[in-house]
Amino acid sequence: MKKFYILIFCFFAFAANSMEKKTTFDKDLFSKAQSEGKIIVISSWIEYCGSCANQMKVLQKAKKEGELLDIKFDNIEYFSFDVTNRDIANSFDVLYQTTLLIFKGETEVYRSIGETTEDLIYEALKASI
């Protein structure tokens, strides 16, 4: 049984570290995107979080594919930040990692915590158009 727990721990540790996690949030770029009325996706993460890595994979897949349900993903600005950066987290009232926010211009149109299901994330992005 102990080996099983070690194996599970190693699996989640690998999953959490398999994605490059870095803060890409920039207040000036965010403000510019808002003033231009763009769709803005913001995700929060923390270093050891496996579900954060899964959510980032879904968002990166959508971006890499270039199209998301008949829209170009490059029409959407994407930012991420480490939830331990309390200045950014507090500015969006984010308390937990794996929080996903979608803005249409200055209006927040979607918020979820822990969502990693590709179909639901894609649906939220499509609904924000």
Name what the model sees in each region:
Residues 1-4:
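Positively charged n-region of N-terminal signal peptides that target proteins for export
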Residues 9-17:
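Hydrophobic h-region of N-terminal signal peptides that target proteins for export
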Residues 17-37, 126-129:
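N-terminal leader/targeting and pre-domain segments
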Residues 35-47:
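Short active-site neighborhood of thiol/selenol oxidoreductases, capturing the structured segment around
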Residues 44, 70-86:
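Thiol-based oxidoreductase modules, predominantly thioredoxin-like and allied folds used
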Residues 53-68:
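Typically the conserved alpha-helix immediately C-terminal to a functionally engaged Cys/Sec
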Residues 92-101:
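Structural micro-motif
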Residues 102-129:
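Non-catalytic, surface beta->alpha helical segment in thiol-disulfide oxidoreductase systems
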